[in-house]
């Protein structure tokens, strides 16, 4: 069983505990991943000034050896600290929209092609019409290939109302 502990780091709140979190899991197989504070909806009072970048966090460690990605679209930049794996998810300072391969389906049956989306595509209607697995797969493929979301890359270029990330499983 692979266990990952994801920790959001926010300036003025917990940036002092970056190394302590990793130290807590030394000697275990737990992978520690640090996440830049993201604008995940309208409820977390996000402010760019409160982002501690992955690079800033990496500088808090003495010796990190880069690891290759496990697969295409991997979101964490991975490192070894001794025998401990540590990752940094840098969606604010180093957006990875072009390599993203993640879609989410909300509890109400909408397919979201971006964690920062303002709306999704209705899959529930297809299911209620007794669509086959192939028809649903074709619809998902079509939605995915037509997607043009790149919110993290375009952050700040326009006002953008987002669905709460917690609603779509982020």
Report residues per predicted region.
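Conserved C-terminal portion of the radical SAM core fold
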Residues: 1-44, 58-64, 108
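Accessory C-terminal segments flanking Radical SAM cores
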Residues: 40-152
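Short flanking/linker segments adjacent to small metal-binding domains or redox-active Cys/His motifs
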Residues: 144-170
């Amino acid at each position: 069983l692979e266990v990952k502990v994801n920790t959001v780091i926010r300036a003025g709140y917990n940036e002092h505990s970056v190394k302590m979190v990793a130290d807590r899991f030394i000697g275990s197989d737990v992978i520690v991943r640090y996440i830049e504070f993201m604008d995940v909806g309208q409820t977390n009072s996000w402010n760019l000034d409160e982002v501690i970048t992955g690079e800033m966090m990496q500088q808090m460690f003495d010796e990190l050896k880069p690891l290759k990605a496990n697969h295409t679209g991997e979101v964490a930049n991975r490192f070894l600290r001794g025998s401990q794996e540590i990752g940094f998810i840098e969606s604010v300072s180093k957006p990875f929209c072009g390599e993203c391969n993640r879609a989410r389906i909300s509890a109400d049956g909408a397919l979201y092609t971006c964690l920062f989306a303002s709306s999704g595509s209705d899959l529930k209607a297809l299911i209620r019409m007794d669509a086959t697995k192939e028809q649903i797969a074709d619809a998902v493929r079509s939605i995915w290939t037509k997607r043009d979301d790149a919110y993290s890359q375009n952050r700040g270029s326009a006002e953008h109302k987002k669905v709460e990330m917690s609603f779509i499983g982020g």
